[in-house]
Amino acid sequence: MGKIIGIDLGTTNSCVAVLDGDKPRVIENAEGERTTPSVIAYTDGETLVGQPAKRQAVTNPENTLFAIKRLIGRRFEDEEVQRDIEIMPYKIVKADNGDAWVEAKGQKMAAPQVSAEVLKKMKKTAEDFLGEEVTGAVITVPAYFNDAQRQATKDAGRIAGLEVKRIINEPTAAALAYGLDKQGGDRTIAVYDLGGGTFDISIIEIDEVEGEKTFEVLATNGDTHLGGEDFDNRLINYLVAEFKKDQGIDLKNDPLAMQRVKEAAEKAKIELSSTNQTDVNLPYITADATGPKHMNIKVTRAKLESLVEDLVQRSLEPLKVALADADLSVGDITDVILVGGQTRMPMVQAKVTEFFGKEPRRDVNPDEAVAVGAAVQGGVLAGDVKDVLLLDVTPLSLGIETMGGVMTKLVEKNTTIPTKANQVFSTAEDNQSAVTIHVLQGERKQAMYNKSLGQFNLEGINPAPRGMPQIEVTFDLDADGILHVSAKDKQTGKEQKITIQASGGLSDAEIEKMVQEAEANKEADKKFEELATARNQADQIIHGTRKQVEEAGEALPADEKAKIETAISELEEARKGEDKEAIEAKIQALMAAAQKLMEIAQQQAQAQQGSAEAGAQSQEDDVVDAEFEEVKDDKK
C-alpha cells in the first residue's frame, strides 16, 4: 500500500504532510515554501496555482480565484454567498442545479473543480518528495462543515485524482498532531481554530490506556463563514472609505485598485501582530482629471482591533455552547491550542486567554498542525501508526421532516461517528401509497430553518388507514461524516436507499467529466513541459555551435560552415513550431552537421595544451641557480 498523505485544504493557504518513518513531516512545495496559497489563476492557456497565481492577481483580478472554500458545497441563494458576491473581484454565478459556481475566462466552474487544482498541486508536491505516485489522501475540513460541504470536498479530491481515504475535522487533526507524542496521562484540550475563512472549536479528551491513545471529541461548534478573510475585508473597507473621504474617489468600482488594496490590507494586518502601527502606502492607486492619486494611510493596532472586535467576540459564543454540550466548565480544560493563521493576532490570543483563564500552548504551529494530524491519520489508516484511536463526532443534528413542518431528529449533534440510528414512522393520511423522506441537518425545530440535504420517495405502500403502515427510516453516518439514508416499508419489505447528495452537488457523471478534463490537462501540461525542454535544448545547442564556429575561424572549411548554418536555420524554424519530434530531429541533424566542428575544437584544444606544456618547459630552462651570502652591516 502506498503512502497516504495528509492535506489541509485551507481557505487562504494549504499544506501537505506525510509520515516519514514514524514522524510526520510537512513537505515543501516547488517554491520552497511549507504552505501554498489556495489561489488559482486562469491565464491564456495556462492554470497557475499557489504563489505564481497570487503574484499576478493585481493584473488579472477577474480570473484569479481565492477563498473558494467559502463556496464549496453552498447554494447560490445562501446568505453567506450573497455577501461574498459583493466583495469578491471574480464572478460568482448560479449553476443549473442552484449551486454557487464561479466564472473565469468565460467558463463556469464548480467550486470542487477549482479546489481540485490546489489538491493537484499538493499531490504533486508529495510525489516529488516521495519519488512515487500518490493516490491516497486524508483531507481535512472545518468541524462545522455540513454534509454537502463534506461531500463537495470529497468530490474535489476525486477530480484531483485522489482516493480520499478519510475526511477528518481540522481541530481533531490538530489535536492528533499535538497529543501524539505527549506523555503524562489523560487530558482535556480545547482546540480554537480560526483560519482564513472558517472557525471551529472542539473539546477533545485524550486518554491513554495501556499504551493506546484515544482521541475522543466531546463536542464541537463553530461558524463556517468567519475567518481571516473577514478580518481583511474590514480593513479593506476602512482603507477604501478613508481614501474616498480624502480624495473623493470610490475605489470599489476598480478591480485592479481593489486587488492592490486587498494585498496591502493583508500585509498590514500581519504586520500589526508584531508592531503597533503601520503605513499602507500605494502610489498611483488611481487617477482622475487632476492627475494620479496615491494612498497613504496610517493604521494602528488599536484601529484594527476596533474594526474587528465584534468578529473576535463572535468566535467566543461557540466556545460557550461547546463547553455546555460537553458538560464541562473552563476549569476542566487542561490545555488550549490555537490553530489557523488568524490566531496570531494578539487580540485573539488575549480574548481566548481571558475566556479560558489560561495561556494557550505555544508548541503548536498554527499553519501546519492540521496537515500533520491528517498525515498521522493517514498513517493510522495505512497501518503504519498503531495504538491511536480517533473518535470524532457529527457537528449538527440529522433528522427528517414530519407532519406540521417539524424536524424529528434521528442523530443528535456531537454523536460519535460512525453511527447508525433508525426510527419507525407512519403515514399522515388514509390510503397513502407513497411517502417523501425529506432529510435535514441543523438544530431548529422548524424544518424550514434547517439545511435541506435532499429528499426521496418510498412508493408502493399498501392502502391502509393513516398511522397503520410502518415505515422504518435508517440513518447511517460514516466515518467521513457523510450520510446514507434508507426507508423500508415493514409490511411489503420495499426499500429505498440513497447516499445523501445535496439537492445541488455534483453528479457522478459530472465528477467523472471533470476527472477526465483534469487528466487531459495533465497530458497537455506534460506535452507543454516536454516541448519547452526541447526548445531550451535547441537554444543551448544553437548558441554553443555558433560560439564554436566563431572560435574555429579559418580552420573550418567553407562548405562545412555552410552545412552548419543551414542546420541552424532549420532548427530555428522547427523551434518556432509545436512539434517536439521535429525539434529533436533537427537537433540531431545539427549535431551531425557540426561533427567536423567538434574535430577542429578537439585539435585546437590539444594544440593549446601542447604549447602550454612547451612554454612551461622553456621557463624551467631559464632558471639560474644562485647562492646568497649574508651581508653584515657594520654601521652603528
Swiss-Prot record:
GO molecular function: ATP binding; ATP-dependent protein folding chaperone; unfolded protein binding
Location of Phosphothreonine modifications: T198
Biased composition (Acidic residues): 619-636
Low complexity composition-biased segments: 601-618
Signals that turn on the gene: By stress conditions e.g. heat shock.
Location of region: Disordered: 600-636
Keyword annotations of the record: ATP-binding, Chaperone, Nucleotide-binding, Phosphoprotein, Stress response
Functional note: Acts as a chaperone.
Name recorded for this polypeptide: Chaperone protein DnaK
Species: Vibrio vulnificus (strain YJ016)
